[in-house]
Structures are given as structure tokens and as C-alpha cells.
Amino acid sequence: MNDLSQKKLIIYIGLGIVLFGAGTLVTYFFLFRGIGAPAEPKEPEPVSENIPGFPEAGPGIGKDPRFGGGNIQPGSDREIPIAAGIRTRLFLVAELASLGTGLSRAEDKIYYFKKDGGELDAFSFPAGTKEPLSTITIVSMVNAFWSPTRDRAIVSYLDGVVTKSFLFKGIGTSSVATLPVGIRSSAWSPTGSSLVYLTEKDGETALATADSSGKNQKTIFRTPIRELALSWPLSEKFALQTNPSGVVPGYIFIFTRASGELTRFLGPTNGLTSLWSPKGEKLLTGSTNAAGKSLSLAIHDSSGKEIFSPDLQTLPEKCSWAREEKVYCAVPRGIPQDAILPDDYRRGELNTNDRLVAIDLKTKIVSGVFNDGGYDMADIVVTKDEKFIFFTDRITGKVWGLEVTQ
């Protein structure tokens, strides 16, 4: 072999050794170095003490960074002890985000629509079994309001930016009836035999009624007042409430069908929100000061006179009447100092961490019922015997049930 060939051979061998060493080093770093090495420490995910796997919420955990922590409004962290002898069992009803909950006639099932797709399901209790009731598809569903007869519901959904509604007419079927486009608010009559709704057009708000099948629609009143919400507490009386804001005075008006008169019932009151009792004999209201803070509750009789003011800071929409003398409310453990109510809550910028309490109007006693987990409770539903309470968590959209014994 000549000298040139020997030099080439030496060079090739040297390059091979270098490449082999580099490959070995790369393999070591990428494949073997991590084996046996301690993992980087991770911050443990907080969970509820009594409900494993569910994150504990703070006083304000909404989208707005103002509510990540800090000071809370005076009096909003009041302790509410659990009543003596009360025992509760929490169970999951719907794992997927849902809305439009309602009880069956026999009060042995809770109905709910899946938010993604709008299918109607039922959860039987206490058995804990589930069954699909309708496969109708509802895209961009907003809400559903069940009739007092518990066999049909007014369903609203978004078509682009336009709100559309229809009447879901039968459990276990896909029978529907179209309602007018642009319904702003709707309600059932106390017996469920009729429905009423509000639409806005040409600078006016129109109040119209229809039968329980959505037929025989008739406009019965018009007003220049805009952005109203509707309730039907008594057969001949309709309650019209102005859009609530903590920084703007609000009103509740009563329209009497027989006389055609519109009269002021409550207001001007900042942060005014409301919830009528089942028979329309009482009204639960929430209000604030002129800055949208210092939230308070009050209960009025049918004339508007205040009859009781429990020392609680919550919104009526987080409450449910079990009967004329009993109200259940979800009460935040604290309200952030910078929160304006009900504005921030209704815009979805604020979530609350709630306890569940009962308000007895006969004894004027407020007692704790449930004080676990990190739930922003809404759409509370209570059985007549008060042994089962259901709520939707606004944070996750899941539906939960609570069995109460004492």
C-alpha cells in the first residue's frame, strides 16, 4: 500500500471514531440521561377536602384579572353554620356541560339539555340511572324554561347574533313549534296552560301571549320601555323588570291584563334583581348601593312591602323557592372588593365560591345546608319534600345533585 493510501485510511478511521463518539453522546443525552433522574417538582392541584378531584374556588375566580384575589366586600364572608342534624350526599348528575334543568312530574327524575348539541337526557334519583329522552339537535343553545306542567319547555338558541326560540312539546319526542324570532324574555303562566313573551321592534317592546302549544299568539300590550325581563306571577298580572345594573337604578312594573294598566311595583333601586315565589304571593329581591356594591336581599309581599331582610349577600338568580315560606340560596363565601353586581356576574367575568343555605320565612332563621367544594351554583331546583336539591355549576356546566337528610 502506498503512502497516499495509508494516509486516506488513517483519515477515514479517524472520522469514523469521531462520528461514533458523537452519536454515542447524542444518544446518551436524549435517551438515557433522563432515566432515574428526579422529575421537576410540580405544584399540586388543589382539590376539595370532601369532593376529590374538584378544584376549590376562591371568592372571585372569573375571567377578569381583578377577581383573582385580594380584598373582599365587607360582610360578604359571613359564616353560616350548618344546621344541627343536617347530613348531605353530593352526586354527579351530568358530567358534560348542560343547561335547562327541570324536575319530572313525579319528582323522581331531573331533566337537562346537553349544551353541546342540545340532546335531552334524564337522571333518575335516587337510583342514579340515566336515559336519553330526545336526540333533537340544538346548536348554540342558550337556555330552556320548563312549564309548570313539566312536559314541555321554551328553548332559546343563537343563530348568528339573532336569538331564536321554539317550543319543545313532548318528553321523549322531537315535536316542536316555532316561536317568533327575537324573543327577549319569556315565561309560563302559573298553571302552565299559556306562555308569554317579549319582542322588540320599531322602538317598542311588545308583550304577547300564546297557548301551551305555541298557537293563538296575541299581542296584549306595548311600551316604549326597552330591555325588559318578564315574569308571570299571577294569572292576570305580568311583571316587567328593567335590565339590572349596580350603577343604574332599576324598576319592576306590573301589567294588569284586565285593566290594561302598567304600574310601578318597585324602584328606583340600584342592582335590582328578583325572583317570584311559586304562587306569586312573595318576591325575593337583590339590590346594591349606587356603586354596585353592598349586595343585600329582601323579601316583599304581593303589595311590594318588605317583610324580611336576611343578612346575606347573594343574587336572587342563585336562589330557588321550595314553597311560599322557604327559599334556598347559594351564597358566595366572599365577593371581591372590585366586583360590580349583578353586572360582572351576569357578564361571566365573575364566578363565586358558594355555600347553600335555607331561609325560613316563618321563623326568620337562616341555616346552612351545604358548605363543601368550589361551586358557582346556578339554576337551583328543589323537590317538594326538600330531600333533593340540584344545581348547575357555572364554572364547568356540570349538573350536581344533593341528597339532604336530617
Q: Language-model features: where?
A:
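Short coil turn/linker residues within repeat-based beta-strand modules
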Residues: 117, 126-129, 170-174, 213-216, ...
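Short, conserved, GDST-rich strand-edge loop motifs in beta-rich repeat architectures
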Residues: 330-351, 401
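Short, solvent-exposed loop/turn segments at conserved positions within beta-propeller repeat blades
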Residues: 113-116, 158-163, 200-204, 244-249, ...
